[in-house]
Amino acid sequence: MGQQVLKFSNEKMEKAVAAYSRELATVRAGRASASVLDKVQVDYYGAPTPVVQLANITVPEARLLVIQPYDKTSIGDIEKAILKADLGLNPSNDGTVIRIAFPALTEERRRDLVKVVKKYAEEAKVAVRNVRRDGNDDLKKLEKAGEITEDDLRGYTEDIQKETDKYIAKVDEIAKNKEKEIMEV
């Protein structure tokens, strides 16, 4: 039973780190990336629809994103949704495609983005620690029920702590790399 708790905790910690990585992909680091539009929802025939389902998104140059809607009538709605998402981007619409030029990041904007990265990192660490707490609680319940011994409890608790430390170090490393990428001029 204790092994199952360890395995389950490990899987949940892995998912927390993966979610953090996906979240960081939406933080732009001066280069154009289609992932900045992942959370943009377009009001398409009354239903909120992700922009990636309505258009082909390409990156022809390092600082340019081109959005080519499958349905030309939705081009205005896509442009409005991008502006409403408040990503600091200014789309330009020529009737067939939307172009988004990514401006070079200012020093102040870079520092703001680093703060966002640190905030996301802290949220990911909290998620990992919550998994640790839940795992430890489950182990204590097993020990109270007599399914594992006190020594097993101590051993499994140490194992969960080692996993927690490993995943928190992974979050720190990902954050450090993203900060370095953002601060690159």
UniProtKB/Swiss-Prot annotation:
Its main location: cytoplasm. Keywords: Cytoplasm, Protein biosynthesis. It comes from the Bacteria. GO terms for biological process: translational termination. GO terms for cellular component: cytoplasm. Pfam families: RRF. InterPro entries: Ribosome_recyc_fac (IPR002661), Ribosome_recyc_fac_dom (IPR023584), RRF_sf (IPR036191). It is found in: Cytoplasm. Gene3D superfamilies: 3.30.1360.40, Ribosome-recycling factor. GO terms for molecular function: ribosomal large subunit binding. Responsible for the release of ribosomes from messenger RNA at the termination of protein biosynthesis. May increase the efficiency of translation by recycling ribosomes from one round of translation to another. Belongs to the RRF family. PANTHER family: MITOCHONDRIAL RIBOSOME RECYCLING FACTOR PSEUDO 1, RIBOSOME RECYCLING FACTOR. NCBIfam families: frr. HAMAP family: RRF (MF_00040). This is Ribosome-recycling factor. It comes from Bacillus anthracis. The lineage of its organism: Bacteria, Bacillati, Bacillota, Bacilli, Bacillales. The gene is frr.
